[in-house]
């Protein structure tokens, strides 16, 4: 299965590496070119015991890119694991999630499964489903 994980923080990076270790073709997508360069070199920008070793063992199934079109075009499943920081009023900032959805829609000619792993408030997945339904 071709899996893209949008966001290579603690949630996204670990997920992408584990998917690759299980034999799936996994792409880790991030807007941070420096982080992508580090990951392509086999180094992790965060501390997670055993992660770099698992990255090395899974390197034949694991790729990192900042090019969202490339990352999304052949994905069977896309995991969105981007930040949802708290706004001043305490609500979640969902612009990164919605930006990922915009890029997915722009890059896809056929459907795929989109899984939101980011922490989002109730109703967000309904909003995302309606968004994709409207553009289909």
Feature map (PLM): residue ranges:
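Rossmann-like NAD(P)(H) cofactor-binding subdomain of soluble oxidoreductases
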Residues: 86-136
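Gly/Ala-rich phosphate-binding loop of Rossmann-like dinucleotide-binding domains
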Residues: 16, 20-21
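N-terminal Rossmann-fold NAD(P) dinucleotide-binding loop
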Residues: 12-13
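Glycine-rich Rossmann-fold phosphate-binding loop(s) that bind the pyrophosphate
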Residues: 8-9
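Conserved N-terminal Rossmann-fold NAD(P) cofactor-binding segment
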Residues: 2, 25, 31-77, 83-91, ...
